[in-house]
Amino acid sequence: SIFSNIKMGKKTKLLFWNCHPLNLIPSLPGFRRLTASTSFLSKLILNTLLISFKLKSRNFLKLLERSKAILFMDGNNLNLSSELLKVKLSKPSFLPIPAKASSKLRWNKTLFKNSKSINFLWIGRIVDFKYFPLKRFLADLTEIQILKKIPVTLTVIGKGKFFDKFYEHATQNENVQLRFIDHIDLYDLDKFILENTDIMVAMGTSALEGAKLGVPTLLMDFSYKEIRGKYNYRWVHETKDYNLGCLINERNYKNNERTLLNKISEFQKSADSISLKELDYFEKNHNLSSVSNQLLDFVSESNCFFEELDSQRVFKKPLIYKFFYSIRKKILKNNFRSP
């Protein structure tokens, strides 16, 4: 089984939440970075080596739709799943990322009226798909500081496998004042954000940590490679279909009016208005209390049971996976034998 550690009764009701654009898309074991995209090569692999697994995933998605047992986190998840599996869902259902609302604390620009610089804050793990967006943001921030002489600071909260690589790159920057913090306790996070942030930069759940406080928050999309060309920045409240970060493709470059400089100009002119829009967007779409109620409704509507999926061998490990795991096992075994 794909999920060999999961044991459940035949009458167990199931509901699937697609939380990553490539969750339903087959990839080669050990080569996820190569196949985790919509590039020509990744599509070629999907439609040749992984064609049988692709068809299986396609049928699985259709089954879940019929059973009202599939939810998508956002439009990006839905669109990429539909595009790569060639499935058009008639009535897709969304369950957005939730976050617990802050009871009293709210962002206020007057807290920074005496500040001579614009203080940016990044929160998030620094891993493969977040490294390149963060690197690109620092490059854009540096360009603005040099050309427009706008004093800026960037605080980075987070660690990860790509932290050392980013730190080495960032510390060569002599234009942007940088500060690195490994971790801040969750109970202290709201207070820290409010006291240290003009503009927050993040993706996913981290972006909601700013929006729920009314902090003007720029969304970053994710990428497994360098980001070229003019990047399209947007506030959280400007996003569509609950997207809090998309897999970068040509659509991210269509609107060249959304440069980082333009967003900074908007902030300088109407920060309080942006703040109210961020907070309103969060309350309407991502507040934990409302999202949890939606989840309960979706659970009651699901007609999917483990017995049906098991009988159709949905969880059976694909042949291509067995082959790759066998080869990898032999390679590792031979390496251990080497002197």
Show the residue positions of the predicted features:
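Membrane-proximal basic amphipathic "stem/tether" segments
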Residues: 29-61, 305-339
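Conserved catalytic-core segment of nucleotide-activated headgroup transferases in glycan assembly
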Residues: 100-165
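Catalytic binding pocket for nucleotide-activated donors in carbohydrate/polymer assembly enzymes
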Residues: 206-268
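Active-site proximal beta-strand in glycosyltransferases
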Residues: 7-48, 71, 92, 219-220
